[in-house]
A protein has these predicted regions:
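Short amphipathic alpha-helical surface patches that serve as generic macromolecular interface elements
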Residues: 95, 114-121, 152-155
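Generic, well-ordered alpha-helical scaffold segments in large soluble proteins
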Residues: 51-58, 123, 158-161
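Long, well-ordered alpha-helical scaffolding segments within enzyme catalytic domains
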Residues: 109-131
Length: 189
């Protein structure tokens, strides 16, 4: 993508630690303890140019990111189908991980970044880009069902098997606690 590509050769360890280095930079500047409304998406390979046009050249064209924006291809063949991570539908051999790891450094940044994130998600939904969020937050169990799609049944089976008392990660709201408190045994799964 013209204007967005740059190459920097780094060691494998430096690549793996790229976000940690950003944290160190922000800590040194005294701005690590600010909100980080990060947005991480998996975008189908066939739609990455539509995403680039609508998001980077559209919604975010005038944005000055305070933090790294990462984009790199992922080989679908390296993802084990037993994993519960939601990846884009389709038979494409690759998809892109897009991470907008921005920080709300100045006054008003948090609200602006959250609006931009919402606009990115709305664009992807309206244009049928078919992206999925990585590490999302959904306000309802129904949102989580839509997020996991065909993997929802598998996820609920794993929850019943490994957390039958429903005590792990209750704050995420993926599985609402049933009236009796035994969420893993409830019909809501």
């Amino acid at each position: 993508m013209p204007g967005f590509a740059f190459v920097r050769d780094v060691s494998y360890v430096e690549f793996l630690d790229r976000v940690g280095r950003e944290e160190q930079r922000l800590r040194a500047a005294g701005v690590w303890d600010v909100p980080h409304p990060w947005l991480n998406l998996f975008v189908p390979r066939s739609r990455i140019l539509d995403f680039e046009a609508g998001v980077f050249r559209g919604i975010l064209r005038d944005a000055k990111p305070a933090g790294p924006v990462l984009m790199y291809p992922m080989n679908r063949g390296r993802w084990d189908g037993r994993m519960t991570a939601a990846t884009p539908d389709g038979g494409e051999g690759a998809f892109y991980a897009v991470g907008m790891l921005r920080s709300a450094v100045a006054a008003g940044d948090l609200e602006r970044l959250e609006r931009e994130n919402a606009a990115v998600l709305a664009f992807c939904d309206q244009e049928g880009v078919g992206c999925t969020q990585y590490l999302p937050h959904h306000a309802s169990p129904d949102g989580w069902r839509r997020h996991f799609g065909e993997k929802w049944g598998k996820l609920t089976a794993l929850k019943r098997r490994y957390d039958p008392r429903g005590i792990l990660s209750p704050g995420q709201g993926i599985f609402p606690a049933a009236a009796g408190g035994d969420e893993a045994g409830s019909d809501s799964l």
